[in-house]
Amino acid sequence: MTSPAPTIGVLALQGDVREHVAALEAGGARAVTVRRVAELRGVDGLVLPGGESTTIDRLLRVFELREVLRERIAEGLPVYGSCAGMILLADRVLDGAPDQQTLGGLDVTVRRNAFGRQVDSWEEDLPLPEITRGGPPVEGIFIRAPWVEEAGEEVRVLARLGSGPAAGRIVAVRQGDLLATSFHPEITGDDRVHRYFVDVVRERVAG
């Protein structure tokens, strides 16, 4: 018997909200947008899209979502952060704005805008065996993206860059039910990263 579709929210303050919603629905979830505390309380998991991490941090406070979201993460809410979402989930940030705060939860140190300006963005196919399960690699599109400088012992490294000046840098991690990627899978039409996250949420809901 197939388990019911989990309800996964997409934080709708900035970023590729529609693309994330479409990828989640293709992956078998019921996707909803989240802008208010009441909407956040009704989800089984959450996606933090890309955008500008300092702006999202400020908007989380404006919409009074920040503390509630920190509490839900501490309680075990599955969360997937892409690009700026990775920064928001990180416990430590290098090259952040002076007053920038994160939600935390991932025992990683990330470097903000590690790939440089938007014109210095990077593309690379990533094997991601835990997600692709023997299939073709995932297209990684990095736009002013962070990378992980250091990862704690409980953090699973899912992908590193294999070429270019940043070869060896960590660009996808998982710790418990928290998932983060430096790249933007939502804009490639490949829903496998989102499908993987939907499975994470489904397993959490099933207990």
Curated annotation (Swiss-Prot):
EC number, as in UniProt: 4.3.3.6, 3.5.1.2
UniProt KW Lyase keyword: yes
Gene3D superfamilies linked to this entry: 3.40.50.880
A GO term for molecular function: glutaminase activity
Keywords, in A-Z order: Glutamine amidotransferase, Hydrolase, Lyase, Pyridoxal phosphate
Residues at the catalytic site: C83, H184, E186
Reactions listed under catalytic activity: aldehydo-D-ribose 5-phosphate + D-glyceraldehyde 3-phosphate + L-glutamine = pyridoxal 5'-phosphate + L-glutamate + phosphate + 3 H2O + H(+); L-glutamine + H2O = L-glutamate + NH4(+)
Pathway given in the UniProt record: Cofactor biosynthesis; pyridoxal 5'-phosphate biosynthesis
InterPro entries in alphabetical order: Class_I_gatase-like, PdxT/SNO, PdxT/SNO_CS
Record's keyword annotation contains Lyase: yes
Cellular component, GO, one term: cytosol
Domain of life assignment: Bacteria
Pfam name, any one: SNO
Entry function: Catalyzes the hydrolysis of glutamine to glutamate and ammonia as part of the biosynthesis of pyridoxal 5'-phosphate. The resulting ammonia molecule is channeled to the active site of PdxS.
Subunit organization: In the presence of PdxS, forms a dodecamer of heterodimers. Only shows activity in the heterodimer.
UniProt-listed PANTHER family: PYRIDOXAL 5'-PHOSPHATE SYNTHASE SUBUNIT SNO, PYRIDOXAL 5'-PHOSPHATE SYNTHASE SUBUNIT SNO1-RELATED
HAMAP family per UniProt: PdxT (MF_01615)
Protein family according to the UniProt entry: Belongs to the glutaminase PdxT/SNO family.
Protein name, entry field: Pyridoxal 5'-phosphate synthase subunit PdxT
Source taxonomy: Bacteria, Bacillati, Actinomycetota, Actinomycetes, Kineosporiales
